[in-house]
UniProtKB/Swiss-Prot annotation:
Protein name, UniProt field: Probable endopolygalacturonase AFUA_1G17220
Gene Ontology BP, a term: pectin catabolic process
Pfam families: Glyco_hydro_28
Organism: Aspergillus fumigatus (strain ATCC MYA-4609 / CBS 101355 / FGSC A1100 / Af293) (Neosartorya fumigata)
Active site: D215, H237
Annotated EC: 3.2.1.15
Catalyses which reaction(s): (1,4-alpha-D-galacturonosyl)n+m + H2O = (1,4-alpha-D-galacturonosyl)n + (1,4-alpha-D-galacturonosyl)m
Main location: secreted
Amino acid sequence: MLKLMGSLVLLASAAEVIASPAAEPVAPSTTLEKRAPCTFSGSNGAAAAMASQKACSTIVLSNVAVPAGTTLDLSDLADGTTVTFEGETTWGYQEWSGPLLKISGKNIKVKGASGATLNPDGARWWDGQGGNGGKTKPKFFAAHDLTSSSSITDLHILNTPVQAVSINGCDGLTITDITIDNSAGDTQGGHNTDAFDIGSSSNIIISGAKVYNQDDCVAVNSGTDITFTGGLCSGGHGLSIGSVGGRSDNTVENVSFTNSQVTNSDNGLRIKATKGKTGTIKGVTYSGITLSSIRKYGILIEQNYDGGDLKGDPTSGIPITDLTMQNISGKGAVASSGYNIAIVCGSGACSNWTWKSVEVTGGKTYGSCKNVPSVAQC
């Protein structure tokens, strides 16, 4: 009897163990470790910033001296990082292709503090040849793959060796109140100092830019939904589409240049489609543009670009459609040796244009316009 009762007790205990619920597993914490604010300065600042970039929530670059032949490479930033330049950022001299600065990431905020300057001291490379020979010159700022509402604000860039800002692979980038001042290059051999070269990018807004240079103020080589507004362009080649054609991406669509001024420049407004190539230029708008002191062409639209303007017969492989030119003020703007408006289109390749309140005078009438849409003047 005792044995029976003992067995029953053991069975009951076992049943309790079996019936007891298993302990709840502990879920791993979903709270990410907070990233720290970081400040870097001096000759070791660039290397330290690059090594620590993933761990910093904010990066302050205070009077950083970047060594010669080095890219200040901030292309591995954590999402949402803010990068602020303070004081003067400088770069050592070396002949190489660059870039001197590279920034990439999602929801990245790049800012210039009051009085801050990014100064690559491009005059050390200037020789009048730009990217066509002479010294090998580094491009300045590769703003590549900046996405998800990234922004660049209040930068002051002084004297780039050649091109200033390359925008490529970006989607949702806003650039506000940036100054690119290469005006010293007018007398010291600056060449190919494009301010903004844009390719394969979408949803780009550049607002309030001030540009003094010796090449395109803006060149949109490919991309969609791009706006340049409230800008000043002085000394260069004006507001350009292209050249389009002969690249991996040859589509330009929905690009607007509005409420801006082009002065002291070779060209005012220019659209360049490369001869013998294919692509698309659609939905480009120039509106509310003031031209003054233009040396060569007030408005130049060409489908025979071949490394130089107006080379031979135009071709039709890159149609220019849905173009709008309106409220273009350029009375007396063009030098007497220049041309007010030149339009050279391939057969049937320029269509559905809007042309309203366009006044560009002071220069000569171009005598070799071709296939001009009836609404336009040439």
